Amino acid sequence: MSHQQIIQTLIEWIDEHIDQPLNIDVVAKKSGYSKWYLQRMFRTVTHQTLGEYIRQRRLLLAAVELRTTERPIFDIAMDLGYVSQQTFSRVFRREFDRTPSDYRHRL
């Protein structure tokens, strides 16, 4: 299996489990590769770290939820694995240059 295929398989697995606690330890265990080698391979293929990919994917899912539902921001944050609404809002604002509430109401 090529590095591209390995990473694509892992990305599919990550996307299926994005609502669960995910970090380099969990994904490395799933892949069977060392954390160091997995990070290197992931960055070579995707041009971003595994942590960046997971964060970006969660934030994109949150943005869809904010656009398409009236679910409370707290619930969206918890469902996507954030430990608090404040943490979620800070990370969301850093990515989208607005708070989740502003994002929801400006669309």
Swiss-Prot record:
Q: Which GO terms describe its molecular function?
A: bacterial-type RNA polymerase holo enzyme binding; DNA-binding transcription factor activity; sequence-specific DNA binding
- InterPro entries, per database record: Homeodomain-like_sf (IPR009057), HTH_AraC (IPR018060), HTH_AraC-typ_CS (IPR018062), MarA-like (IPR050959), Tscrpt_reg_AraC-type_HTH (IPR020449)
- Quick one: a GO biological-process term for this protein? regulation of DNA-templated transcription
Q: Which domain of life is it from?
A: Bacteria
Residues in HTH araC/xylS-type domain copies: 8-106
Q: Which residues bind DNA?
A: 25-46, 73-96
Record carries keyword Membrane? no
Gene Ontology cellular component annotations, sorted alphabetically: cytosol
> According to its UniProt record, where is this protein located?
Cytoplasm
Keyword terms of this UniProt record: Activator, Cytoplasm, DNA-binding, Transcription, Transcription regulation
- UniProt function note: Transcriptional activator of the superoxide response regulon of E.coli that includes at least 10 genes such as sodA, nfo, zwf and micF. Binds the DNA sequence 5'-GCACN(7)CAA-3'. It also facilitates the subsequent binding of RNA polymerase to the micF and the nfo promoters.
What is the official name of this protein in its record?
A: Regulatory protein SoxS
Q: Which organism is it from?
A: Salmonella typhimurium (strain LT2 / SGSC1412 / ATCC 700720)
What is this protein's gene name? soxS
